[in-house]
A protein has these predicted regions:
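N-terminal glycine-rich phosphate-binding loop for ADP-containing cofactors
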Residues: 1-348
Length: 348
Protein backbone atom coordinates (compact mmCIF):
# COMPACT_ATOMS: atom_id res chain seq x y z
CA UNK A 1 0.00 0.00 0.00
CA UNK A 2 1.47 3.38 -1.05
CA UNK A 3 0.73 6.34 1.23
CA UNK A 4 -1.44 9.02 -0.31
CA UNK A 5 -0.61 12.70 -0.23
CA UNK A 6 -3.03 13.03 2.70
CA UNK A 7 -1.54 10.16 4.70
CA UNK A 8 -4.09 9.03 7.28
CA UNK A 9 -2.58 8.14 10.67
CA UNK A 10 -4.51 6.57 13.55
CA UNK A 11 -3.18 6.92 17.10
CA UNK A 12 -4.80 4.13 19.11
CA UNK A 13 -5.39 4.58 22.85
CA UNK A 14 -2.34 6.79 23.42
CA UNK A 15 -4.02 9.54 25.42
CA UNK A 16 -2.70 13.08 25.50
CA UNK A 17 0.94 11.93 25.46
CA UNK A 18 0.75 12.08 21.66
CA UNK A 19 0.31 15.89 21.52
CA UNK A 20 3.76 16.65 20.10
CA UNK A 21 3.42 13.91 17.50
CA UNK A 22 -0.01 15.19 16.47
CA UNK A 23 1.39 18.69 16.01
CA UNK A 24 4.20 17.37 13.80
CA UNK A 25 1.82 15.27 11.71
CA UNK A 26 -0.46 18.24 11.17
CA UNK A 27 2.53 20.27 9.99
CA UNK A 28 3.28 17.40 7.60
CA UNK A 29 -0.26 17.70 6.19
CA UNK A 30 -1.34 14.29 7.45
CA UNK A 31 -4.87 13.38 8.43
CA UNK A 32 -4.84 12.43 12.11
CA UNK A 33 -7.40 10.36 14.01
CA UNK A 34 -6.93 10.06 17.77
CA UNK A 35 -8.84 6.91 18.66
CA UNK A 36 -9.81 6.34 22.29
CA UNK A 37 -12.01 3.24 22.72
CA UNK A 38 -13.64 4.58 25.89
CA UNK A 39 -15.99 7.56 25.46
CA UNK A 40 -14.98 9.17 28.77
CA UNK A 41 -11.31 8.90 27.80
CA UNK A 42 -12.09 10.35 24.38
CA UNK A 43 -13.81 13.36 25.93
CA UNK A 44 -10.93 13.95 28.35
CA UNK A 45 -8.24 13.56 25.68
CA UNK A 46 -10.13 15.84 23.28
CA UNK A 47 -10.29 18.54 25.96
CA UNK A 48 -6.57 18.28 26.78
CA UNK A 49 -5.44 18.20 23.15
CA UNK A 50 -7.65 21.11 22.10
CA UNK A 51 -6.14 23.20 24.89
CA UNK A 52 -2.58 22.19 24.03
CA UNK A 53 -3.01 22.32 20.24
CA UNK A 54 -5.45 25.12 19.44
CA UNK A 55 -6.27 25.19 15.75
CA UNK A 56 -4.64 21.83 14.95
CA UNK A 57 -6.65 19.71 12.54
CA UNK A 58 -7.21 16.32 14.15
CA UNK A 59 -10.22 14.14 14.95
CA UNK A 60 -10.90 12.36 18.24
CA UNK A 61 -13.08 9.29 17.83
CA UNK A 62 -14.13 6.07 19.55
CA UNK A 63 -14.74 4.23 16.27
CA UNK A 64 -12.05 2.35 14.38
CA UNK A 65 -11.91 3.42 10.71
CA UNK A 66 -12.12 0.81 7.99
CA UNK A 67 -8.67 1.73 6.78
CA UNK A 68 -5.67 3.97 7.36
CA UNK A 69 -2.09 4.28 6.15
CA UNK A 70 -0.28 4.19 9.50
CA UNK A 71 -1.56 2.73 12.78
CA UNK A 72 0.44 3.75 15.88
CA UNK A 73 -0.27 1.82 19.06
CA UNK A 74 1.09 -0.18 21.95
CA UNK A 75 2.00 -3.75 21.11
CA UNK A 76 -1.00 -5.12 23.00
CA UNK A 77 -3.31 -3.29 20.58
CA UNK A 78 -1.57 -4.18 17.31
CA UNK A 79 -4.31 -6.65 16.39
CA UNK A 80 -6.72 -3.70 16.10
CA UNK A 81 -4.90 -2.27 13.06
CA UNK A 82 -7.01 -2.04 9.89
CA UNK A 83 -5.91 -4.31 7.03
CA UNK A 84 -2.91 -3.23 4.93
CA UNK A 85 -1.87 -0.39 7.26
CA UNK A 86 1.69 0.06 8.47
CA UNK A 87 1.69 -0.90 12.16
CA UNK A 88 4.10 1.07 14.36
CA UNK A 89 4.30 -0.21 17.94
CA UNK A 90 5.73 2.05 20.63
CA UNK A 91 6.91 -0.56 23.13
CA UNK A 92 10.37 -1.36 21.74
CA UNK A 93 12.16 -3.78 19.41
CA UNK A 94 11.31 -6.79 21.56
CA UNK A 95 7.60 -6.25 20.84
CA UNK A 96 8.12 -7.28 17.22
CA UNK A 97 8.69 -10.89 18.31
CA UNK A 98 4.98 -11.21 19.10
CA UNK A 99 3.56 -8.87 16.45
CA UNK A 100 0.39 -10.36 14.91
CA UNK A 101 1.56 -9.45 11.40
CA UNK A 102 5.35 -8.93 11.44
CA UNK A 103 5.51 -8.32 7.69
CA UNK A 104 3.77 -4.96 8.12
CA UNK A 105 5.02 -4.06 11.59
CA UNK A 106 7.89 -1.95 12.90
CA UNK A 107 8.76 -0.66 16.36
CA UNK A 108 8.98 3.12 16.48
CA UNK A 109 9.67 5.60 19.27
CA UNK A 110 8.11 8.70 17.79
CA UNK A 111 6.08 10.42 20.52
CA UNK A 112 8.80 13.09 20.58
CA UNK A 113 8.99 13.70 16.83
CA UNK A 114 12.16 15.81 16.93
CA UNK A 115 14.19 12.60 16.73
CA UNK A 116 12.93 9.04 16.42
CA UNK A 117 14.18 5.50 16.91
CA UNK A 118 12.98 2.70 14.71
CA UNK A 119 13.51 -1.06 14.76
CA UNK A 120 12.57 -2.99 11.62
CA UNK A 121 12.88 -6.53 12.96
CA UNK A 122 12.30 -8.97 10.10
CA UNK A 123 10.04 -6.64 8.13
CA UNK A 124 10.53 -6.74 4.35
CA UNK A 125 12.04 -3.87 2.39
CA UNK A 126 8.60 -2.59 1.37
CA UNK A 127 7.57 -2.14 5.01
CA UNK A 128 10.89 -0.51 5.88
CA UNK A 129 10.41 1.91 3.00
CA UNK A 130 6.90 2.81 4.20
CA UNK A 131 8.20 3.52 7.70
CA UNK A 132 11.02 5.64 6.31
CA UNK A 133 8.60 7.64 4.15
CA UNK A 134 6.40 8.29 7.19
CA UNK A 135 9.39 9.60 9.16
CA UNK A 136 10.35 11.77 6.19
CA UNK A 137 6.87 13.32 6.19
CA UNK A 138 7.37 14.08 9.88
CA UNK A 139 10.62 15.82 8.91
CA UNK A 140 12.46 14.02 11.69
CA UNK A 141 15.87 12.45 11.93
CA UNK A 142 16.04 8.92 13.27
CA UNK A 143 18.37 6.20 14.47
CA UNK A 144 17.92 2.51 13.69
CA UNK A 145 17.91 0.26 16.75
CA UNK A 146 19.00 -3.28 15.94
CA UNK A 147 19.05 -4.95 19.34
CA UNK A 148 18.49 -4.44 23.03
CA UNK A 149 15.47 -4.33 25.30
CA UNK A 150 13.50 -1.16 24.75
CA UNK A 151 14.44 1.96 22.85
CA UNK A 152 17.67 3.55 23.93
CA UNK A 153 16.17 7.02 24.15
CA UNK A 154 13.58 5.75 26.61
CA UNK A 155 16.25 3.88 28.53
CA UNK A 156 18.27 7.07 28.83
CA UNK A 157 15.21 8.95 30.07
CA UNK A 158 14.40 6.22 32.57
CA UNK A 159 17.98 6.12 33.83
CA UNK A 160 18.04 9.91 34.23
CA UNK A 161 14.82 9.91 36.25
CA UNK A 162 16.21 7.13 38.44
CA UNK A 163 19.21 9.33 39.26
CA UNK A 164 16.94 12.29 39.93
CA UNK A 165 14.57 10.28 42.13
CA UNK A 166 17.46 9.12 44.31
CA UNK A 167 18.96 12.61 44.61
CA UNK A 168 15.61 14.01 45.71
CA UNK A 169 15.49 11.43 48.49
CA UNK A 170 18.81 12.62 49.94
CA UNK A 171 17.68 16.23 50.17
CA UNK A 172 17.75 18.03 46.79
CA UNK A 173 14.47 19.72 45.88
CA UNK A 174 12.97 19.32 42.39
CA UNK A 175 13.18 23.01 41.50
CA UNK A 176 16.75 23.39 42.81
CA UNK A 177 17.84 20.37 40.79
CA UNK A 178 16.07 21.54 37.63
CA UNK A 179 17.72 24.96 37.92
CA UNK A 180 21.12 23.34 38.43
CA UNK A 181 20.59 21.07 35.41
CA UNK A 182 19.76 24.07 33.23
CA UNK A 183 22.85 25.87 34.56
CA UNK A 184 24.86 22.77 33.60
CA UNK A 185 23.62 22.93 30.01
CA UNK A 186 20.29 21.11 29.83
CA UNK A 187 17.77 22.83 27.58
CA UNK A 188 15.16 22.31 30.30
CA UNK A 189 15.17 20.73 33.74
CA UNK A 190 14.45 17.02 33.58
CA UNK A 191 11.46 17.30 35.88
CA UNK A 192 9.82 20.03 33.83
CA UNK A 193 10.43 17.85 30.79
CA UNK A 194 8.76 14.91 32.50
CA UNK A 195 5.76 17.08 33.31
CA UNK A 196 5.51 17.93 29.61
CA UNK A 197 5.75 14.29 28.50
CA UNK A 198 3.45 12.98 31.24
CA UNK A 199 4.67 10.98 34.22
CA UNK A 200 2.40 8.08 33.33
CA UNK A 201 4.46 7.36 30.19
CA UNK A 202 7.66 6.41 32.04
CA UNK A 203 5.59 4.82 34.82
CA UNK A 204 4.09 2.38 32.31
CA UNK A 205 7.58 1.37 31.21
CA UNK A 206 8.66 0.87 34.83
CA UNK A 207 5.64 -1.32 35.53
CA UNK A 208 6.46 -3.44 32.49
CA UNK A 209 10.08 -3.88 33.60
CA UNK A 210 9.35 -4.35 37.31
CA UNK A 211 11.23 -1.18 38.30
CA UNK A 212 10.09 0.97 41.22
CA UNK A 213 10.93 4.59 42.03
CA UNK A 214 9.80 5.86 45.41
CA UNK A 215 8.94 9.45 44.58
CA UNK A 216 7.97 9.25 40.90
CA UNK A 217 5.71 6.22 41.42
CA UNK A 218 3.91 7.80 44.37
CA UNK A 219 3.23 10.89 42.28
CA UNK A 220 1.50 8.83 39.61
CA UNK A 221 -0.55 6.99 42.24
CA UNK A 222 -1.67 10.38 43.60
CA UNK A 223 -2.68 11.64 40.15
CA UNK A 224 0.29 13.98 39.64
CA UNK A 225 0.65 13.11 35.97
CA UNK A 226 2.14 16.34 34.67
CA UNK A 227 1.13 19.46 32.86
CA UNK A 228 -1.83 17.88 31.06
CA UNK A 229 -3.69 17.55 34.38
CA UNK A 230 -2.34 20.74 35.95
CA UNK A 231 0.01 19.13 38.47
CA UNK A 232 3.13 16.97 38.37
CA UNK A 233 6.54 17.86 39.72
CA UNK A 234 5.22 21.43 39.51
CA UNK A 235 1.77 23.00 39.49
CA UNK A 236 0.37 24.66 36.37
CA UNK A 237 -2.44 26.97 37.55
CA UNK A 238 -4.85 27.80 34.77
CA UNK A 239 -2.79 25.77 32.32
CA UNK A 240 0.02 28.33 32.54
CA UNK A 241 3.69 28.02 33.40
CA UNK A 242 5.33 25.90 36.08
CA UNK A 243 4.94 27.01 39.70
CA UNK A 244 6.82 25.50 42.66
CA UNK A 245 4.63 23.19 44.73
CA UNK A 246 5.70 23.13 48.42
CA UNK A 247 3.72 19.92 48.94
CA UNK A 248 6.31 18.11 46.81
CA UNK A 249 9.02 18.72 49.38
CA UNK A 250 6.85 17.27 52.16
CA UNK A 251 6.09 14.20 50.04
CA UNK A 252 9.77 13.58 49.29
CA UNK A 253 10.81 13.94 52.94
CA UNK A 254 8.07 11.50 53.91
CA UNK A 255 9.16 8.92 51.32
CA UNK A 256 12.79 9.21 52.43
CA UNK A 257 11.77 8.68 56.05
CA UNK A 258 9.67 5.62 55.18
CA UNK A 259 12.62 4.15 53.24
CA UNK A 260 15.16 4.95 55.95
CA UNK A 261 17.20 7.18 53.62
CA UNK A 262 19.19 9.86 55.42
CA UNK A 263 20.01 13.28 53.94
CA UNK A 264 23.42 13.61 52.27
CA UNK A 265 25.14 17.01 52.07
CA UNK A 266 25.43 17.89 48.36
CA UNK A 267 25.34 21.16 46.47
CA UNK A 268 22.85 21.63 43.66
CA UNK A 269 25.71 21.84 41.14
CA UNK A 270 27.17 18.57 42.44
CA UNK A 271 23.74 16.94 42.09
CA UNK A 272 23.57 18.07 38.44
CA UNK A 273 27.07 16.66 37.87
CA UNK A 274 25.90 13.38 39.41
CA UNK A 275 23.02 13.17 36.94
CA UNK A 276 25.33 13.88 33.99
CA UNK A 277 27.88 11.30 35.15
CA UNK A 278 25.12 8.72 35.43
CA UNK A 279 23.78 9.54 31.97
CA UNK A 280 27.24 9.18 30.40
CA UNK A 281 27.66 5.85 32.19
CA UNK A 282 24.27 4.63 30.94
CA UNK A 283 24.99 5.83 27.40
CA UNK A 284 28.15 3.73 27.18
CA UNK A 285 25.98 0.66 26.68
CA UNK A 286 24.55 2.22 23.52
CA UNK A 287 27.98 2.07 21.92
CA UNK A 288 28.32 -1.57 22.97
CA UNK A 289 25.02 -2.24 21.17
CA UNK A 290 26.31 -0.69 17.95
CA UNK A 291 25.08 2.90 18.24
CA UNK A 292 27.40 5.57 16.82
CA UNK A 293 28.68 8.46 18.93
CA UNK A 294 26.60 10.78 16.73
CA UNK A 295 23.54 8.68 17.56
CA UNK A 296 24.36 8.82 21.27
CA UNK A 297 24.68 12.60 21.12
CA UNK A 298 21.43 12.97 19.18
CA UNK A 299 19.44 10.83 21.61
CA UNK A 300 20.88 12.61 24.65
CA UNK A 301 19.99 15.97 23.14
CA UNK A 302 16.49 15.18 21.90
CA UNK A 303 15.41 12.85 24.71
CA UNK A 304 17.07 14.66 27.62
CA UNK A 305 17.88 18.13 26.33
CA UNK A 306 21.59 17.56 27.04
CA UNK A 307 23.87 18.62 24.16
CA UNK A 308 27.33 17.24 23.30
CA UNK A 309 27.23 14.24 25.62
CA UNK A 310 30.37 12.52 24.32
CA UNK A 311 32.29 15.80 24.30
CA UNK A 312 31.30 16.34 27.93
CA UNK A 313 32.54 12.86 28.78
CA UNK A 314 35.91 13.51 27.15
CA UNK A 315 36.20 16.83 28.95
CA UNK A 316 35.79 15.00 32.28
CA UNK A 317 38.17 12.23 31.18
CA UNK A 318 37.86 8.50 31.73
CA UNK A 319 39.78 8.51 35.01
CA UNK A 320 37.87 11.52 36.31
CA UNK A 321 34.53 9.97 35.39
CA UNK A 322 35.38 6.66 37.03
CA UNK A 323 36.42 8.49 40.19
CA UNK A 324 33.17 10.48 40.13
CA UNK A 325 31.07 7.34 39.71
CA UNK A 326 32.95 5.57 42.48
CA UNK A 327 32.29 8.45 44.87
CA UNK A 328 28.60 8.50 43.92
CA UNK A 329 28.23 4.85 44.87
CA UNK A 330 27.98 6.16 48.43
CA UNK A 331 24.60 7.56 47.35
CA UNK A 332 23.52 4.42 45.48
CA UNK A 333 25.94 1.62 44.70
CA UNK A 334 23.83 0.19 41.89
CA UNK A 335 22.74 3.33 40.04
CA UNK A 336 26.24 4.76 39.75
CA UNK A 337 28.18 1.51 39.29
CA UNK A 338 30.68 2.06 36.41
CA UNK A 339 29.54 0.33 33.23
CA UNK A 340 31.80 -2.39 31.76
CA UNK A 341 31.43 -0.48 28.47
CA UNK A 342 32.46 2.89 29.88
CA UNK A 343 35.76 2.96 28.01
CA UNK A 344 33.95 2.95 24.65
CA UNK A 345 32.92 6.58 25.24
CA UNK A 346 36.63 7.41 25.25
CA UNK A 347 37.61 5.08 22.41
CA UNK A 348 39.35 2.62 24.71
Amino acid sequence: MTERADTHVVLYDLGSSSADLIAAMCLGHMRVTVLEPDQADADRVRDVLQRRLPGAGFTVSTRLPEGCDVFICHASDAQMAPPASLVAVLDGPEALATAPEPDRSVAMDVLDPRFAEVAFGNAPDTTRARATRFLAKLNTGFAVTTRGHGFWGNRLQDAAISFVDRLLLIGITPWELDEALEDAGFAQGLLKSQDHIGLDVAFARRRASGTDLLVADRMVHEGRLGRSVGVGWYRYPGGGGAVIDPLMEDMIVEEARFAGIDPVPMTDAAAADAVIAGIINAAAGMLQDGMTTDGVDALAFYKLGLPDLTARAKQIGESGLRNRLTALQAVDATLWCPSPSLGLIFGS
